């Protein structure tokens, strides 16, 4: 695989400036070297034995690789640290950027283990407590030259968290089969489909299905998964839930202070929470955000189902920690409390909202871990590279501007001389002639004006139709060349979005082999914030 680098803007201004190195990092983060961070972490203590005990039991049910189990054991050692990042439990792993985030975690962990000479464990935080199924219940595929969204219908109306939703084996198998039909048959299709069937057969829930695939894909690399909704993990988190509940007002104050500071610097707000938000969810089968009524001195849910005094909430956390989970503000705090975090791998959106957490971390006398932007890739297949060469377009041009403008320019250069001008002149002359006819009609009967104006519109519409008809015939005449532009757009910029946010990794595994992810993992990436163009 050949790699070239390209500078592309991120999805928000703050992340773009952070990646480019123009953001004033001291305003929102605690910049430090990995060596300095390691020294800081060694001064702190963690519930290592309890965490290792849980992770070993959790991964055993998935028959995780020896490499993963060995990495978990490393966490017992006081000098060990982690590189961590997370994502929702998307079906079939979701868009490519989830795979790229895991590759980023593993790659940075390996590099820092060599440089720091301490165990550095790659950890993936699976946000299995998320209940927004619309974000994970589909896969995009290419069908008839368009982006097609294949939704797994049993999840469409689900309100529960991914960790609690059991799979419908028959419906899931049919959904998988339909997706594979769009890929086309290759010499590895049957093997890959069987691979996914096996993952499905050993999975009970949506979260299990995700974890099984990831643990198989990255078995040799020893990736460790944290199931955020697991009841045994929640039991370990009990103590910190207590602290978060007690400190919710201070958390909100610190958050809002930092948000105002960033607003003064000209940055948009990324986290939107109510001033009364308690930053914890309570889940009795339905996940509800807790708020705090200062006048009544109690926690409550907006639907009025629950009200807790501070003491009652503490008792609930003590007796049923599995019913509580974090919001966008407290999840990073829980991660920091649980794991000796050498670095956090972040996507563009995460960079923006972590920037608002600096003072929240400081409230707990912590420094934020180094925030490392995840690797961002575009995969260029050989036939797409050939199409680019044929239409004299670079990857940079395709990713930055898309192909629409280039195609329109090519069509203008290959259409009859003065094509647009001829139709423009025809409309102008027809309007003049029709004006004469209308004046004649008005002399006969002034009431004809409305009818004649509508007739003028119909005449112009017919000229537009004729222009569109000739344009379509020109496109058909140049069909081979036009399709090259369309293929480029569909592959590299589907729906005018980054490739990594649309396509799924299974398409590429079906074309390039079951070891595709492993080969992608072993490309020599540079951590410089540049977008990577990978030629397959």
Curated annotation (Swiss-Prot):
Domain of life of the source: Bacteria
Recite the UniProt keywords alphabetically.
Answer: Ligase
Query: What enzyme class is recorded for this protein?
Result: ligase
Q: Which Pfam families match?
A: CC_BshC, Rossmann-like_BshC
EC number(s) stated in the UniProt entry for this protein: 6.-.-.-
Molecular function GO labels: ligase activity
Protein family membership: Belongs to the BshC family.
Function statement: Involved in bacillithiol (BSH) biosynthesis. May catalyze the last step of the pathway, the addition of cysteine to glucosamine malate (GlcN-Mal) to generate BSH.
Q: Supply the name of the protein.
A: Putative cysteine ligase BshC
**Encoded by which gene?**
bshC
């Amino acid at each position: 695989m050949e790699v070239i680098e390209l500078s592309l803007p991120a999805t928000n201004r703050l992340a773009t400036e952070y990646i480019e190195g123009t953001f004033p990092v001291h305003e929102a983060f605690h910049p430090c070297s990995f060596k300095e961070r390691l020294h800081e972490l060694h001064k702190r203590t963690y519930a290592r034995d309890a965490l290792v005990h849980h992770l070993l039991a959790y991964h055993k049910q998935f028959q995780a690789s020896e490499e993963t189990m060995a990495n978990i054991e490393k966490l017992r050692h006081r000098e060990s640290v982690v590189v961590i990042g997370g994502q929702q439990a998307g079906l079939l792993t979701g868009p490519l950027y989830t795979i790229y985030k895991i590759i980023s975690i593993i790659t940075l962990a390996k590099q820092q283990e060599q440089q720091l000479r301490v165990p550095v464990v790659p950890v993936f935080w699976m946000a299995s407590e998320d209940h927004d199924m619309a974000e994970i219940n589909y896969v995009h595929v290419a069908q008839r030259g368009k982006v097609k969204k294949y939704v797994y219908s049993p999840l469409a109306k689900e309100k529960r968290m991914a960790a609690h939703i059991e799979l419908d084996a028959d419906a899931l198998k049919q959904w998988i089969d339909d997706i594979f039909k769009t890929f086309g048959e290759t010499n590895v299709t049957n093997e890959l489909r069987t691979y996914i069937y096996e993952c499905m057969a050993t999975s009970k829930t949506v979260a299990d299905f995700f974890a099984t695939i990831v643990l198989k894909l990255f078995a040799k690399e020893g990736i460790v998964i944290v199931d955020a909704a697991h009841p045994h993990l929640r039991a370990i988190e009990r103590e910190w839930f207590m602290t978060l509940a007690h400190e919710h007002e201070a958390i909100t104050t610190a958050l809002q202070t930092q948000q105002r500071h960033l607003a003064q610097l000209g940055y948009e707000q990324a986290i939107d929470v109510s001033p009364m938000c308690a930053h914890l969810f309570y889940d009795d089968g339905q996940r509800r955000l807790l708020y705090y009524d200062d006048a009544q001195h109690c926690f409550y849910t907006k639907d009025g189902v629950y009200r807790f005094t501070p003491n009652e909430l503490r008792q609930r956390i003590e007796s049923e920690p599995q019913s509580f989970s974090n919001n966008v503000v407290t999840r990073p705090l829980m991660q920091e409390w649980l794991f000796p975090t050498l670095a956090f791998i972040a996507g563009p959106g995460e960079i923006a909202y972590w920037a608002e957490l600096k003072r929240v971390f400081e409230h707990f006398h912590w420094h934020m871990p180094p925030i490392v932007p995840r690797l961002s890739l575009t995969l260029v297949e050989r036939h797409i590279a050939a199409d680019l060469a044929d239409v004299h377009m670079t990857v940079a041009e395709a990713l930055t501007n898309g192909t629409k403008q280039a195609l329109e320019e090519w069509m203008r250069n290959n259409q009859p001389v003065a094509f647009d001008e001829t139709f423009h002149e025809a409309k102008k002359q027809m309007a003049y002639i029709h004006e004469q006819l209308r004046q004649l009609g008005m002399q006969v009967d002034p009431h004809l004006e409305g009818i004649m104006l509508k007739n003028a519109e119909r005449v112009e519409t017919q000229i537009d139709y004729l222009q569109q008809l000739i344009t379509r015939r020109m496109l058909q005449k140049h069909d081979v060349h036009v399709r090259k532009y369309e293929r480029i757009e569909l592959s590299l910029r589907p729906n005018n979005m980054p490739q990594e946010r649309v396509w799924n990794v299974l398409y590429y595994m079906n074309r390039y082999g079951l070891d595709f992810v492993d080969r992608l993992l072993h490309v020599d990436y540079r951590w410089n914030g540049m977008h990577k163009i990978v030629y397959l």
